């Protein structure tokens, strides 16, 4: 009801909750390439967990996987976004380390 009150046309809204970051970014890429959407919002980048991390064991080190995933996806999406005129918004979250002051 809140979305409707804001003017969101729910029948035209596409919502996806993929299992992995790769899957989510592939869905985003396919939608942009199709030209069927004018704007795409990814909320949140922090929730785009790489497949290797999901399939791995607890405690395994996956240094830089998410950064590589996003870097590759953005390189791939940039041209398509430009060509189709689609707007992409990526929402992330700020995480703080306990006991660390700003700038440290």
From Swiss-Prot:
The keyword ATP-binding applies. Can catalyze the hydrolysis of ATP in the presence of single-stranded DNA, the ATP-dependent uptake of single-stranded DNA by duplex DNA, and the ATP-dependent hybridization of homologous single-stranded DNAs. It interacts with LexA causing its activation and leading to its autocatalytic cleavage. GO terms for cellular component: cytosol. It is found in: Cytoplasm. GO terms for biological process: DNA recombination; DNA repair; SOS response. This is Protein RecA. Belongs to the RecA family. The keyword Ligase does not apply. Keywords: ATP-binding, Cytoplasm, DNA damage, DNA recombination, DNA repair, DNA-binding, Nucleotide-binding, SOS response. The gene is recA. PROSITE patterns: RECA_2. It comes from Leuconostoc mesenteroides. One of its GO terms (molecular function) is single-stranded DNA binding.
């Amino acid at each position: 009801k809140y979305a409707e009150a804001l003017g969101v046309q729910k029948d035209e809204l596409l919502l996806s909750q993929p299992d992995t970051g790769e899957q989510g970014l592939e869905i985003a890429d396919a939608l942009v390439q199709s030209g069927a959407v004018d704007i795409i919002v990814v909320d949140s980048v922090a929730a785009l967990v790489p497949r290797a991390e999901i399939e791995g064991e607890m405690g395994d080190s996956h240094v830089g996987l998410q950064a590589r995933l996003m870097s590759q996806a953005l390189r791939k999406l940039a041209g398509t976004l430009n060509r189709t005129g689609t707007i992409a918004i990526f929402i992330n979250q700020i995480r703080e380390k306990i006991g660390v002051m700003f700038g440290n």
